[in-house]
Amino acid sequence: MAKITTFKGYDSDSSAQRPDEKVLPNIVTARDGIPVKYPNCEGLGVRIVHPANPKAPAQNMGLIMFYIPPHVTFEPSNHHTEECYVILRGQGTMILAGDEIQVKAGMFVHLPPWCEHGIENTGDETLEVLICTSPP
């Protein structure tokens, strides 16, 4: 494990102004999300915290639950957004910049902008992936 560091706070030069009124959180579940189909994939995404979801309309990030049925592939692609895939359940193969990497529950995969990536569910249960994307 890496050396533990101390959190030093956030940069106070943020362009986001603190509002005068109390800011309330948005508390949602995957059932509150907005379903989305992706081209060339039989998997289903659910936009949970995302500009498209009026129940949790994030501005600078997106959290999407992605459900990939057994033996289904989400073909490789790339885009300008930065992402992190958190493998919550199941196992599969990710295609990352042309290389195949085995992934399973408990793994985190950080994808810089324009990094080619795809994922295949190689198991017999639904592969569940939490995707964090910025910008959404």
Regions found by a protein language model. Name each.
Residues 50, 69, 88, 104, ...:
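Residue-level detector of conserved, well-ordered beta-strand and adjacent loop positions
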Residues 65-66, 84, 110, 124-136:
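A short hydrophobic beta-strand segment most commonly corresponding to one strand
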Residues 84, 98-114:
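Short acidic-glycine-tyrosine-enriched beta hairpin
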Residues 64-66, 106-107, 117:
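Hydrophobic/aromatic beta-strand elements that line small-molecule binding cavities or substrate pockets
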Residues 65-70, 78-94, 132:
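Short, conserved beta-strand element in jelly-roll/cupin
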Residues 45-52, 62-79, 113:
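Conserved short histidine dyad/triad with adjacent acidic residue
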Residues 1-60:
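A short, N-terminal "cap"/entry segment at the start of jelly-roll beta-barrel domains
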Residues 74-76, 94-95, 111, 117-124:
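Short beta-strand His + acidic residue motifs that chelate non-heme Fe in jelly-roll/DSBH
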